[in-house]
């Protein structure tokens, strides 16, 4: 029984793709789902910050995880949505599939799960031409090389 449960959980985690080169096309990693253990999740977030992995990969949070307003629907009280911007898909993958994240950081929020999250990655769209002068560019001013991040062994 234990083997079946473990196999089902492992099957939901995508196998790491071959490392890529950063193409300077920013992506947004969306973490969404109910949080069950807020203090443990905050400790996990602090460990990510202290690890320096986001700094090395040019990643940063775009929002606080709790809404300030709800315009439609009734989200559960414990719903968390967090958006993390990376300079490219290669660096988002370097983070997710790194030995540091998979072997050290991610286990801090598992067994039992501090929350039930879906983690997806989307391409960032450019600012509309008519608005570009008013809001400026979201471009990165230096390169972040995710290829130096040690990959988890799977």
Range-by-range predicted roles:
Residues 52, 100-106:
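A common structural junction motif
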Residues 94-100:
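Short cationic/low-complexity microdomains
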Residues 5-80, 86-94, 121-154:
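Short S/T/G/P-rich N-terminal loop/turn motif that feeds into the first structured element of a domain
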Residues 45, 96, 105-109:
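Short, flexible helix/strand-to-coil boundary loops that buttress conserved ligand/catalytic motifs
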Residues 60, 105-122:
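Conserved short beta-strand edge segments in small beta-sheet-based binding/regulatory domains
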